[in-house]
Amino acid sequence: MKKRIEIEAKFELLNDKQLLERLEKNSEAKLVGENEIQKDTYFTPNDRNFLDKRPVAEWLRTREEKSKYSITYKNWAKEDGENAKFKCREVETNVDDIEAIKEIFDVLKVKELVVVEKTRTSYLYKDIIISIDTVEKLRKFCRVRIWNKYI
């Protein structure tokens, strides 16, 4: 069975204008999303808090984007051994009824931690998605992602 590989890096963006200029001048970079609004709500189980462990290695999130909803669980873990690498178990699915998910969370005593709203502009360069995120009440970030590669 083939395994899906996703490589992703995020970092604070100190000069978004410079990055935008380079992407716009590059004929191979195509604008694939502009000023898309994402609303992420993060949750944690009642019996433990995902924020207690630093760096945060586990999270549960719902996302609203263009009247579409999804739910994602991620858990980062370090492999054993001398040359250990980090791996992420990620489970994500689309959701038709976000209010039903919130009600399920309420019944299971899964509590809301924080809501993060951001505006994302994305470019596709070869097999790489380069996104500029403006996070409300924070700052700008760049996300570089290679995904849907199978080995």
Regions found by a protein language model. Name each.
Residues 1-127:
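N-terminal strand-loop-strand beta-hairpin
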Residues 127-133:
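Short glycine-rich, acidic/polar surface loops and turns
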